[in-house]
Amino acid sequence: MSIMDKLKKNSKLSHTSVLSESKFFTEKDMVPTDVPMINVALSGSVDGGLAPGLTVLAGPSKHFKTSFALLMAGAYMKHHPDAVMLFYDSEFGSPDSYFKQFGIDTSRVLHTPITNVEELKFDLIGQLEELDRNDKVVVVIDSIGNLASKKELEDAKNEKSVADMSRAKALKGLFRMSTPYLAMKNIPLIAVNHTYQEIGLFPKAIVSGGTGIYYSADNIWIIGRQQDKKGTEIQGYHFVINVEKSRYVKEKSKIPITVSWEGGVKSYSGLLDCALAGGYAVKPSNGWYATVDQSSGEVGPKVRYDGTLDKSFWDPIFAETDFKDFLKKQYSIGHQSLVEMDEIVVEE
């Protein structure tokens, strides 16, 4: 009997296995969304997507955090027709229309209202404990940033005006306990969170809830935004995903996603910045864009900015060039960036 076999036999834990054969490394489910640059932000690859583990979407109010969470959860449920969403709700700001917008059948959503961190902790751990690895479940928490601790609520009931030092500790415990379950049972958890500005001459956004979230999360996004204007009229927003932490993507990467009032998320937004930087597209004249033949240098038909948001503009680039590899090298950990991504292209 080899040393490996002896150690494996002596282990008291049922999931012990050789690393190269471990299902926790070789059978990781990764579900793509319909938005290529969201897949890049999650995994570093256009063909990647939402993976098991904790993903935190943080930002100020009205920064599309819940919608990003539902977009990912909707993709998971579309990919797995038998999947169920476990939706923990402390904000009650997601009407039925939000779910329908992302193709989510609300009869497959278990809605659990919560009022404090301890309620969330006890219920979530209880649910995860009873699930099997083959159960297809996606968990969404909206939001942890708005959750009080049980002590804070009790103090308010008893008219005590004292500082609450237990909330960060409770959140740290919640994610410390849930992280192994998410990995071992192949479950993605998407948590919406808030940010605050640190004090200083050059303040930066800080994810609320303490350091426990940073330790446990596989992905942390801090979401910013710019107005999408036509003249003086606001048509929507250019949201910028700032990758604060990732197991797959280079930290501090900035990925823009455009959302309009009328059409919702522009699926192919964010790609133009990369294509221009890598030479897969050019700007032949002000306000016009075109694809470029990589072998001959021939410039394709010119289109306006709106035309670059159409599938027809990108299909030839993905099919006939190495643009996917370029994006992977640009954003994924373990590769050297090929170009500097400073500019975010917006409609002129």
Specify the residue positions occupied by each region the protein language model found:
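Conserved inter-motif catalytic segment of the P-loop NTP-binding fold
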Residues: P60, L71-M72, Y76-G173, M177, ...
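Generic beta-sheet signal
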Residues: G53-L57, V137-I141, I187-L189
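Hydrophobic/aromatic beta-strand patches that form the interior of the parallel beta-sheet core
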Residues: T55-L57, L86-Y88, L110-T112, I190, ...
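C-terminal regions of RecA-like/P-loop NTPase motor modules
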Residues: M1-E21, V31, D228-E348
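Conserved NTP-handling cores and scaffolds of large molecular machines
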Residues: S11, L42-S45, Y76, H80, ...
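Phosphate-binding/switch region of NTP-binding enzymes
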Residues: D164-G278
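The Walker A/P-loop phosphate-binding site
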Residues: S2-R108, G126
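Solvent-exposed alpha-helical segments within well-ordered globular domains of core cellular machineries
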Residues: D5, P36, V40, L71-G74, ...
